[in-house]
């Protein structure tokens, strides 16, 4: 309890937690029902849904390298986060007046345009939000995992609300996402503890400040891929997270909702289930850093693998 109160006394922790909470809430309010929306409201087949997700992932993969390079040059500045928030505000108008008509007139053109927007505003933006939060945690004396956990909490609350909004009017989930993004932009612009010299002097870790002042060269970035340990981690992520994500996002929602008498009942139940799952994720993200310090990173990963195998 003492550690939690100490964390909340840190303005950098409070601001970073709120920003990442709003990002995941604004994304989760519609993303948690994206597959259901595509199949039940737009009538697309599983193959078409897979195509839409694949296009989005492909564009996001390219953008992640671009975004990563840009953020390295910006350092702690939140310029890109503000840009993402502006793009996210457009999610309601985009889905209502652009995406649906384009998919109806030409599926592949609509899928490509949608992939670009989703990657720019959400899919490739997510790692940037997480990376900035992680950098801030090292520089301003707070635990990254405990700040990132608030993102899962925001997603959990959003998923719970989405189930009820979706059954009322599917478009509500997108427009609510726009509203949350607008609040996020206000927070990004107005809450800037890093501009307060007294707060910076109190919480800044000087050694991390010196590290941040050095921007890695292109050669240093490429040099990372020569490390065997990096490739081990890449293979691990591909063989675990990728398969889980495809099942979780594209297959499970439709599978689960079939067990209910009406589509509406299934959609509401899925929203509740998804919310509970992400809320447990929120709790674990606060506890895992403590566990990792006790047993080590390697053993923590092996424990995670054992749980996934079950």
Regions from the PLM with identified roles:
Residues 1-11, 192-234, 258-262:
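Juxtamembrane intracellular "pre-TM" segments in multi-pass secondary transporters
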Residues 80-81, 301:
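Primarily marks hydrophobic transmembrane alpha-helices of the MFS/SLC 12-helix fold
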Residues 86-105, 307-310:
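C-terminal ends and interior cores of transmembrane alpha-helices
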Residues 62-76, 165-166, 283-297:
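Helix-to-loop junctions at the C-terminal end of transmembrane segments
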Residues 114-151:
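Cytoplasmic helix-loop-helix junction between adjacent transmembrane helices
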Residues 60-61, 141-163:
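Glycine-rich segments within core transmembrane alpha-helices of 12-TM secondary carriers
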Residues 2-61, 229-237, 241-261, 266-273:
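Helix-loop boundary and gating motifs at the non-cytosolic
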Residues 158, 173-190:
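Symmetry-related core transmembrane helices of the 12-TM Major Facilitator Superfamily/SLC fold
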